[in-house]
Curated annotation (Swiss-Prot):
Official protein name in the record: Transcriptional repressor NrdR
Domain of life: Bacteria
Described purpose of this protein according to its UniProt entry: Negatively regulates transcription of bacterial ribonucleotide reductase nrd genes and operons by binding to NrdR-boxes.
Domain ATP-cone: 49-139
Amino acid sequence: MRCPFCSCENSQVKDSRPTEDGTAIRRRRQCEECGARFTTFERIHMRDIVVIKKDDHRQPFDRSKLIRSVSIACRKRPVSPDQIELLVNSIQQKIEASGESEITAVRLGEMTMEGLRTLDSVAYIRFASVYKDFTEARDFEDFARSVRSVIEAVKE
């Protein structure tokens, strides 16, 4: 495995274990050249999933793009990278379990919002603001108000 710090090809596996949800193997590695430690994940590749965009063009599902989007929404929030990884794993498992090889970007966005809603309400609102293309402060206010009323209803 190539070291992300010095690009050396030789690294040694220091620890290997399955992830919490059992969908991957997490490996802690140490570069034999610079000594840096890094983590890799090994996953089973089920099938190629295609995302149908709003303009009808198709592109391969990009797990790292979804992780980036969720990470941006969760920035400076009490959400760990492991929680983000679990959320994305859950979404990907649901897509694969559906048996379909294609999913609309709309459905993918909805699934992501569903997961974020239970994870962190601020991250949920941040993601929704981009996904739903809020154009005015009022859009934020209305959405935040609806989220607040749902949270209060759940608490009662």
